[in-house]
């Protein structure tokens, strides 16, 4: 029986003084271990999603942690019959998730995590506004019941949406979510930096929530878009048959 392919997604907001210096070291170990996918590096941290054997993706993760020394790191592993990535890329970026907001220190300044087990009860409270921080094409195929869709084409448009909807957000508890946690974590940092106090986000994102809860209360509706060859996953995290042929993004 063939071994399942492990798909490891990870990120951490951590100060990296010279991120370019890490690229050759990460490329070397990932190539040696036949790992495919993408790792983004910047001065604000790292963001990666890569696939291979369980042992080998964890060896790449260990090297990434050794080189960056984060205070905490978010890690999620799923499995697939096939590699969801065709190539290996390690890239230097200005931001590990592009928002185009200067001087945002997510490592020090962010909202509170809500664990998967507490998410359903939290987002159904009367004084909580739930915001999907993903792009409109992602929201279109699945989202949480009653979540607000900002209808953004890219994450860079999210700050403008926040400023345009001050009346909607003011005085509310704001709960945000995204695929794996990184965009909603950065979104909480944005809101905290401009004066919002009660800001929360789903720890580990939609994928962790679906694994932990199996969507037992049916608050998640539809499928979850993912940025690899699977295109989308069902609420049991199996690849979507309906969206397998969607064009790559």
From Swiss-Prot:
Active site (UniProt): 178 (cysteine persulfide intermediate)
GO molecular function: oxidoreductase activity, acting on paired donors, with incorporation or reduction of molecular oxygen
Catalytic activity of the protein: uridine(34) in tRNA + AH2 + O2 = 5-hydroxyuridine(34) in tRNA + A + H2O
SMART domains assigned: RHOD
Domain Rhodanese stretches: 124-218
Keyword terms, alphabetized: Oxidoreductase, tRNA processing
Lineage: superkingdom: Bacteria
Listed EC numbers: 1.14.-.-
Sequence similarity: Belongs to the TrhO family.
UniProt-recorded name of the protein: tRNA uridine(34) hydroxylase
Species in which this protein is naturally found: Rickettsia canadensis (strain McKiel)
């Amino acid at each position: 029986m063939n071994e399942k392919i492990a798909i490891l997604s990870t990120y951490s907001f951590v100060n990296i003084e010279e991120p370019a210096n890490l690229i050759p070291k990460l490329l070397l170990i990932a190539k040696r271990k036949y790992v495919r996918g993408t790792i983004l590096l910047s001065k604000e941290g790292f963001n990666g999603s890569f696939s291979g054997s369980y042992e080998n993706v964890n060896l790449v993760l260990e090297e990434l942690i050794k080189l960056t020394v984060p205070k905490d790191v978010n890690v999620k592993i799923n499995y697939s019959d096939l590699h969801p990535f065709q190539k290996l890329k390690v890239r230097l970026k200005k931001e590990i998730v592009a928002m185009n907001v200067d001087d945002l220190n997510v490592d020090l300044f962010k909202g509170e995590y809500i664990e998967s087990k507490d998410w359903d009860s939290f987002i159904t409270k009367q004084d909580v506004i739930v915001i999907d921080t993903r792009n409109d094409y992602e929201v279109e195929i699945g989202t949480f019941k009653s979540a607000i869709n900002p209808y953004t084409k890219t994450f860079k448009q999210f700050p403008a949406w926040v400023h345009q909807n001050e009346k909607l957000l003011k005085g509310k508890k704001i709960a945000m979510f995204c695929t794996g946690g990184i965009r909603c974590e950065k979104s909480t940092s944005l809101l905290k930096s401009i004066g919002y106090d009660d800001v929360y986000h789903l720890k580990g994102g939609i994928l962790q929530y679906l694994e932990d809860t199996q969507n037992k209360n049916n608050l998640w509706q539809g499928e979850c878009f993912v940025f690899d060859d699977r295109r989308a996953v069902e609420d049991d995290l199996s690849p979507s048959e309906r969206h397998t042929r969607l064009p790559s993004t």
